[in-house]
């Protein structure tokens, strides 16, 4: 026990000092950053180190242990975008992702360009000076907020696509945040014609029809930082950060909903009503890959098709009917380049697979869990995890990030639609308890939404812990015990 605690403190001290792990020597099983604003991260499992890639346009957010949008990671808001902007339209986005991000880390952060206005410059005043302990907005319509504890500030950001609501002191949909009223702009006259075929050339441009051939380029002129529609009933949206426009793609089968500013099911998007959408073909039950070396696949059960995603860094094997590492997937071996094909298929999952731990495919450790269940998909509590039972064979798959599996509709949907989710209007899925048999994913997990007890899963073994300090509870997002006053769910 003392050894595990000591290793945990060593890992936290290493991260706090700015020294990043390059291997798993003396490191606990888990996820680790390998640098600032990096699109890759390190996974440690049984002492074995693996470098995993985030989906396209995302970087690793170490406090939340997920791949996240750059503007959601404190200190990375302006990095990597300036050089991409200078390289020109069309190929500019693609080159910005390669050399742009690298140069952003080398020079962008150091010079403080973009919105990095003096972070870490030593000139900032203490924002908690004279404030009582509690949560505060960073100002206006923003995803950023901070906690003041004993005159010390801790800066956080809401998970995409939520914004901080001062009135309720929690993250909420943008449409419900008073400070954001009047900032939701839907321009039906210009944004619908030939949007962004040139802009999207570096990111999944296959989803765009290409009409306009780049003559119209989305712009953030006159718009505050945030998310905006990019057309009517389209599978992409516009993000504005520091005046720079980017077209982002929704996960497979989802359409951007301008009313709540999230990627949503077409049935819930008012603009799509009356428009024909192709129904997925699902003649036989089973699991079917989206293509060569892909992290996305379709689960067919009782004639219904459900789009699923492998955990981060894994690909779906049609032959083995499971998610696995690239070198164990035949489709990836046949591809010409494992690295490039991995990133290409990773784009399909969008923000959907960022929070997964990257451990191998998640076959359940309890083979008897499907004995009393029918063949099909079953929810594992209020979580993105899905239990698959097929003739006694057990697998665990995942819904996209921020979604949970709804057993009534048999789709991945928002938490408030699931009977197993008791907390409404929250995406703090990492804090929900997991079922006792499911210890296939290595890491630290809370025993409840506001609990002083937590447990560690390592190689299928479960170890229980209790926070030592009075009023301390375990935060799954921070992977450590924190004061209960700093967690919104404890208020």
Curated annotation (Swiss-Prot):
Residues 87-120 have a biased composition (Gly residues). Disulfide bonds join 54-67, 158-171, 250-263, 310-323, 399-412, 467-481. Keywords: Cell cycle, Cell division, Chitin-binding, Developmental protein, Disulfide bond, Glycoprotein, Proteoglycan, Repeat, Signal. SMART domains: ChtBD2 (SM00494). GO terms for cellular component: extracellular region. Pfam families: CBM_14. Residues 80-126, 187-217, 336-367 are annotated as: Disordered. One of its GO terms (biological process) is embryo development ending in birth or egg hatching. Residues 200-210, 356-367 have a biased composition (Low complexity). Residues 21-78, 125-182, 217-274, 279-334, 367-423, 436-491 form the Chitin-binding type-2 domain. SUPFAM superfamilies: Invertebrate chitin-binding proteins. GO terms for molecular function: chitin binding. Glycans are attached at residues 197, 201, 464. Residues 1-18 form the signal peptide. InterPro entries: Chitin-bd_dom, Chitin-bd_dom_sf, Chitin_bind-dev_reg. It comes from the Eukaryota. Required for polar body extrusion during cytokinesis in embryo development. Affects cortical granule size. Shown to have roles in meiotic chromosome segregation, osmotic barrier function and polarization in conjunction with cpg-2. Binds chitin. This is Chondroitin proteoglycan 2. It comes from Caenorhabditis briggsae.
């Amino acid at each position: 026990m003392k050894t595990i605690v000591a290793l945990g403190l060593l890992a936290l001290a290493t991260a706090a000092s700015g020294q990043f792990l390059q291997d798993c020597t003396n490191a606990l099983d888990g996820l680790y950053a390998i640098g600032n604003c990096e699109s890759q991260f390190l996974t440690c499992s049984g002492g074995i180190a693996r470098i995993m890639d985030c989906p396209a346009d995302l970087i690793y957010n170490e406090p939340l242990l997920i791949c996240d949008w750059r503007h959601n990671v404190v200190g990375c808001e302006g990095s990597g975008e300036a050089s991409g902007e200078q390289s020109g339209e069309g190929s500019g986005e693609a080159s910005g992702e390669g050399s742009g991000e690298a140069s952003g880390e080398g020079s962008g952060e150091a010079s403080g360009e973009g919105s990095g206005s003096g972070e870490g410059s030593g000139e900032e005043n203490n924002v908690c000076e004279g404030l009582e302990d509690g949560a505060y907005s960073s100002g206006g319509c923003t995803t950023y907020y901070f906690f003041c504890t004993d005159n010390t500030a801790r800066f956080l950001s809401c998970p995409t696509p939520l914004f901080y609501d001062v009135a309720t002191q929690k993250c909420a949909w943008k449409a419900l945040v008073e400070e954001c009223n009047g900032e939701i702009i839907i321009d039906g006259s210009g944004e619908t014609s030939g949007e962004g075929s040139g802009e999207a050339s570096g990111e999944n441009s296959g989803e765009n029809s290409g009409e306009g051939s780049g003559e119209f380029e989305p712009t953030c002129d006159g718009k505050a930082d945030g998310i905006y529609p990019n057309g009517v009933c389209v599978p992409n949206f516009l993000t504005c950060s520091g005046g720079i426009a980017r077209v982002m793609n929704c996960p497979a089968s989802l359409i951007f909903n301008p009313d709540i500013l999230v990627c949503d099911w077409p049935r819930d998007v008012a603009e799509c009503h009356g428009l024909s959408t192709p129904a997925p073909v699902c003649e036989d039950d089973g699991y079917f890959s989206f293509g060569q070396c892909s992290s996305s696949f379709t689960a067919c059960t009782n004639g219904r098709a459900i789009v699923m995603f492998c955990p981060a860094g894994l690909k779906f094997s049609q032959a083995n009917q499971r998610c696995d590492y690239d070198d164990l997937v035949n489709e990836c071996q046949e591809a010409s380049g494992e690295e490039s094909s991995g990133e290409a298929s990773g784009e399909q999952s969008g923000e959907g697979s960022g929070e997964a731990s990257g451990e191998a495919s998640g076959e359940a450790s309890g083979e008897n869990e499907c004995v009393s269940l029918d063949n099909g998909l079953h929810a594992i509590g209020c979580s993105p995890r899905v239990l698959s039972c097929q003739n006694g064979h057990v697998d665990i798959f995942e819904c996209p990030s921020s979604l949970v599996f709804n057993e009534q509709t048999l789709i991945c949907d928002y938490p408030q639609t699931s009977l197993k989710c008791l907390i409404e209007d929250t995406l703090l899925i990492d804090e929900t308890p997991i079922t006792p048999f499911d210890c296939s994913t290595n890491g630290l997990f809370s025993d409840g939404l506001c609990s002083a007890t937590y447990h560690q899963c390592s190689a299928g073994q479960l170890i229980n812990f209790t926070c030592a300090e009075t009023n301390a509870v375990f935060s799954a997002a921070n992977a450590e015990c924190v004061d209960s006053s700093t967690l919104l769910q404890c208020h």
